């Protein structure tokens, strides 16, 4: 595999960081609040294609729309 997937623990940590006290989640891109993480994805801030690593400081939670809009930019 060219780019290894984000490990389960890293994903869980990213979602935990995006979780509000009421259990909802916030998209780091648009700021929209989601009641569950169903429509959210863990994203590399600096894409792996551009040298980004799968480390906590390079991960954020985005809604599908923001993640698709971002692509590898």
Language model features: what each stretch is:
Residues 31-61, 73:
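Histidine-centered nuclease catalytic patch
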Residues 1-29, 53, 57:
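Short, charged surface segments at domain edges that flank catalytic/cofactor-binding sites
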Residues 66-73:
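A short, conserved beta-to-alpha structural element at the edge of catalytic cores
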């Amino acid at each position: 595999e060219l780019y290894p997937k984000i490990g389960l623990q890293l994903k869980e940590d990213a979602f935990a960081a995006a979780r509000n006290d009421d259990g909802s989640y916030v998209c780091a891109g648009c700021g929209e609040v989601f009641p569950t993480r169903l429509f959210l994805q863990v994203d590399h801030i600096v894409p792996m294609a551009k040298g980004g690593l799968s480390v906590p400081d390079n991960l954020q939670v985005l809604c599908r729309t923001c993640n698709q809009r971002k692509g590898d930019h």
